[in-house]
């Protein structure tokens, strides 16, 4: 095992000098020998003259020049397999839940090749979420990649928690949750909610259904940059065993941001909006590995923060290209008090095709979108001239669109605590029946307020009797 010496420390980036013939390879893990606690460096560049530039996987406080560093000769490797279930780990795969060490038989390196074309498989099997607006307008595919796009405070994490609740609890498979640069409180809430739901079993961890990997907001950029790969590596191991895995990543934007933080320190010229020049490649390396093979599938749900609500920002724009379904959250819908604040006109899915979802579903979804689009166009006229100036046909469109907007809302299980309304899971056939009736004009005489926060159309009719 070769050793070197620290020669320079710039925040999260450290230069280490090795003897000329024994320079570590890029992505090799190095251990700092004299550090108070375990500290790992990951090689990013070979500068020349035996010096390598590394990212610190932890806090660089207390490091000084001249400390001895050992080369492990291999990339960072993390525990994989059933021993990780029910546990909370950090970027290095060390347990941080105070329930003892993880004695896994197998460890995988976090840097791995994406599956080849021959190994990949594509599926058109739909994944029902029980959320009306998603199942109708942007249906998810089993083994697909889903992105939840939204600015600050419009409900990305709540929507993700509801999807975990509806999919992970109904689906008997395993899940991996990667918390990338998000609030520690949310990770804590998630852990305790999973315990209450029986998905995490502290007494018998091997009976748990979820593994959690956290690198939160307060962590150095090295942790946030690599923690998504740690979670993905664990999910890949379950997939290769022939299981169907759910991978939840909250938040993919922080992964990009961590790359931006270290990029300048590594001496790269910034590109558009100050992002790293390697943005597309870094995103591709992660996303290409999140895929389904002939052995098993990985269905991933990723929250994507949209800076300043600008979907053309390079980070969300780069993410768009990799996804099968995009769920776009809209601040204006949230401001109207309509939750989930998912925009049915902006959200898209490759599965919304008559050959996949069937002609009836396709027609209902497009009918809902065209009604809402027409209402959007008429809003300016209504604002200036009022409703009275519209033709009878347009008045009918406006009335139906307002009912559709209200009927797209529904109470969430995870929001019960602060709304007081019990959550509702709506099967797809009930969703289609409700919207089909609304488009056909079967409920033109029902007051629009009856459609707010109800599940099936029958619930709305019950509510209307009480109004």
UniProtKB/Swiss-Prot annotation:
Alphabetized HAMAP family for the sequence: ATP_synth_beta_bact (MF_01347)
Molecular function terms from GO: ATP binding; ATP hydrolysis activity; proton-transporting ATP synthase activity, rotational mechanism
InterPro entries: AAA+_ATPase, ATP-synt_VA_C, ATP_synth_F1_bsu, ATPase_a/bsu_AS, ATPase_alpha/beta_chains, ATPase_F1/V1/A1_a/bsu_N, ATPase_F1/V1/A1_a/bsu_N_sf, ATPase_F1/V1/A1_a/bsu_nucl-bd
EC code: 7.1.2.2
Pfam families attached to this UniProt entry: ATP-synt_ab (PF00006), ATP-synt_ab_N (PF02874), ATP-synt_VA_C (PF22919)
Subunit structure: F-type ATPases have 2 components, CF(1) - the catalytic core - and CF(0) - the membrane proton channel. CF(1) has five subunits: alpha(3), beta(3), gamma(1), delta(1), epsilon(1). CF(0) has three main subunits: a(1), b(2) and c(9-12). The alpha and beta chains form an alternating ring which encloses part of the gamma chain. CF(1) is attached to CF(0) by a central stalk formed by the gamma and epsilon chains, while a peripheral stalk is formed by the delta and b chains.
Primary enzyme class: translocase
Protein name according to UniProt: ATP synthase subunit beta
Gene Ontology, cellular component aspect: plasma membrane; proton-transporting ATP synthase complex
Primary location: membrane
Lineage: Bacteria, Pseudomonadati, Pseudomonadota, Gammaproteobacteria, Vibrionales
Function: Produces ATP from ADP in the presence of a proton gradient across the membrane. The catalytic sites are hosted primarily by the beta subunits.
Family affiliation: Belongs to the ATPase alpha/beta chains family.
